[in-house]
Amino acid sequence: MLGPISYFHFDYFPAIFAVAAVAALLYGRGVLACALAAAGATVKVYPVLLIPLALIELWRRGGARAVAKGVGAAVAVLAAVLGPFAVVAPHGLTWALHVETARALEVESVGASFFAFAHALFGVHLHVVLTSGGSHGIAGPGARTVSALLAVAMAAALAAAYVRYFLCARGPEDLVAAAATVVVVYIVFSKVFSPQYLVWLIPLVLLIGGRRGLRASALLIVILAVTQIFEPYNYVHYFRMSTPWVAYVVFFRNLLVVGLLGLLVWPKPLEQHAQQLDPDRASGFG
């Protein structure tokens, strides 16, 4: 669905762990879900976002003792995988973390696409650099400010998603939708948005049931199709900021991803009715 990009990256592996963690939760195996999510996080960090959902389910079914088991399983997996690297090459591990956290605002990210759009439409000057991670980013105080604001917004949006799930979730569809939501939140507010990140969404969005699931799946297909307009063959024109229409396409694609987030968090009619009956019990984005 992403053309040549999907053949040269390993994002399928964390996606498999993530969907396996969701499947474990659907079958009531919260501790296993924590372990699977932690294993996926050692490949790409995003599956760790599923652990709070698993802990919520463990709390509902077994209280603090079950939560402790879930946390223990996640920590054990992380220690088993990352522990040897921390012992053999601690500086290498900390350097890898530094490289990831210090990266510039990647040009395809939602935040950077606003800069690119302004450059294409109004001629706003941009300073694009090659980052240590091999991607292209926007440098400068404005980009750093946007990166910081995105980090705060991500933390707030994730917290809201978890609170909403804790207060309002009623069944398997809500669990799958919550899992997809936190991953989309991560993509929207991250300072990096590589096209292969969309692989993460495919299994989660397709699992969502009902009309919301159909609409979300249709929108995701459109997002994948639009991404192929500029990736990989027109990407060079984009990071060089030499072809305005490519910047417009990237901006439009990112607006669609934001729209996907809006679709996932929009209250269902039943949830809206619950808010009217008991506003203290029902909570969420909407």
How should these model regions be labeled?
Residues 87-88, 118-128, 233-236:
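Membrane-helix interface motif
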Residues 123-142:
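Juxtamembrane membrane-water interface segments that cap and precede transmembrane helices
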Residues 78-121:
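Aromatic-rich transmembrane-lumenal/periplasmic boundary elements in polytopic membrane proteins
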